[in-house]
Amino acid sequence: MNFRRYMIVTTALLLGGFTVAQADDVSMASGSVHFSTPSNWVGIMQVDGDPEVRVFQVPDPSPSASTTLARVSVTVKQVTNLQDFNDYVGGAVAKAKQLKDYQPGQSRSSDQNSFVYTASESGTPYTYIERYWFHDGHAIQLRCARPSASEAGQQWAATFDKGCSSIASTLGT
């Protein structure tokens, strides 16, 4: 990890209420949002308030992991109605489109609130999958970001994607 990126991540963690803990069962938004993570995912950031955020590092066993950060975040923001939810999603998508080397990917046609794209972080191509739900007065964002190519191979990427989909299936109910 280059020094600048290291300092940015360190500062974000310190400002965000740094928490390092093994993740399993997670409850957010005063208990109205629940999900579980694989036990080897490490909670690296927790922000309480509005929005409420949890970020988990997904271990990458390869040498390329020293310069990348595979992660999954869940953000919960209070919204009063469907229009506010749509505005929240639109703002997040607009922000994603500003990332360096942004390229839209192929989302499943059955999921209108799912967005797949690639972009660069510190010169490394990343694949992002973002999903959104409106539930009980909250906009919920699940954002899964991993290097597009890891020396850990396709099996690791498939395991990462499976963990992300597992959280999505829980949040979507």
Predicted regions and their residues:
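N-terminal "mature-domain start" segment
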Residues: 24-53
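Sec/Tat signal peptide C-region and signal peptidase I cleavage site
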Residues: 18-23
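Conserved polar/disulfide-associated segments of primarily extracytoplasmic proteins
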Residues: 47-129, 134, 139, 148
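Bacterial N-terminal signal peptides that target proteins for export
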Residues: 1-8
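Bacterial N-terminal signal peptides
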Residues: 8-17
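Surface-exposed amphipathic alpha-helical segments
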Residues: 142-173
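Stable alpha-helical elements in mature extracytoplasmic
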Residues: 37, 84-92, 156-163
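Soluble non-cytosolic domains of exported or imported proteins
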Residues: 32, 79, 83, 151-158
